[in-house]
């Protein structure tokens, strides 16, 4: 049964995606910078996760006053997967958009997917209206629900068990699928 988050999906294309997925991501463990960043994250240092994510994505490091740092840390700690509503407040910070927030949340939780324009285009091709709008946290929320739907719908052999977050495998697979 197809999850509600995948309502309208081209079922044949979705099945073809899952058949191809293991080969599409078989080199995921070769991305040393991603793996080093992923395993550099420590449980109770959520503001450090922001630095790690920014470094991994080659972004300029943040330079916020202490009150903003505390606010960001509070939002990161209180946001519960898959809800992205609390993250909207972070979009008011200079240089922060849904793409950047998704990277922070991915490295902080290993649950949230990294927002990707290529992945959104593949989801669109599968019949799932999933716009890529980095200036709109709701569009990221829709992307999160689509990825969660794919996780729920994945056949046993569709998601390789290679020790990396399933959301990362799906994101990479969607980016590489043709």
Residue positions per predicted region:
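Short helix-capping/linker segments at secondary-structure and domain boundaries
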Residues: 62, 112, 177-178
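Cytochrome P450 catalytic-core helices
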Residues: 103
